[in-house]
Curated annotation (Swiss-Prot):
The species this protein was found in: Mus musculus (Mouse)
Listed name of the protein: Microfibrillar-associated protein 5
InterPro entries reported for this sequence: MAGP (IPR008673)
Motif window: Cell attachment site: 30-32
Function: May play a role in hematopoiesis. In the cardiovascular system, could regulate growth factors or participate in cell signaling in maintaining large vessel integrity. Component of the elastin-associated microfibrils.
Primary location: secreted
Gene field: Mfap5
Similarity-based family: Belongs to the MFAP family.
Length: 164
């Protein structure tokens, strides 16, 4: 019976606490503001970013230079932001007077990363040709200056009724 009294006291206490007293949202749930990185993808590795000066001393072998002579001339390293939002459950301890309890709260962690990919000229040309085919345009070698132009490929999916 004593256990029922504690539940009733906790219920009355939860109802009587004003809603603005409870910290809602992401800010204010933890005391430390340490940015954490989480990933569920096993292919991604959260290594610390390397500095360009640290990589300046590393020279590729002659085999790598011979094989990549044409690739480096037509390819470039493109950097892009790959920001992810992760949802995690964190234990949060709340104390009211002398009684404390721990609850699991959902927190959202933003993982800001800069990713890079190798973009080659021939891949861009293939993508451009595929985009032209999807838009109903002729291949680039048969293009005439007075041919009707459609919007770019990225916008075509938005204009189709089934593209949503």
């Amino acid at each position: 019976m004593l256990f029922l009294g504690q539940k009733a006291l906790l219920l009355v206490l939860a109802i009587s606490i004003p809603s603005d007293w409870l910290p809602l949202g992401v800010s204010g749930q933890r005391g430390d503001d340490v940015p954490e990185t989480f990933t569920d993808d096993p292919n991604l590795v959260n290594d610390p970013s390397t500095d360009d000066t640290a990589l300046a001393d590393i020279t590729p072998s002659t085999d790598d230079l011979a094989g990549d002579k044409n690739a480096t001339a037509e390819c470039r390293d493109e950097k892009f932001a790959c920001t992810r939002l992760y949802s995690v459950h964190r234990p949060v301890r709340q104390c009211v007077h002398q009684s404390c309890f721990t609850s699991l709260r959902r927190m959202y962690i933003i993982n800001n990363e800069i990713c890079s990919r190798l973009v080659c000229k021939e891949h861009e040309a293939m993508k451009d040709e595929l985009c032209r085919q999807m838009a109903g345009l002729p291949p680039r070698r048969l293009r005439r200056s007075n041919y009707f132009r459609l919007p770019p490929c990225e916008n075509m999916n938005l204009q189709r009724p089934d593209g949503l």
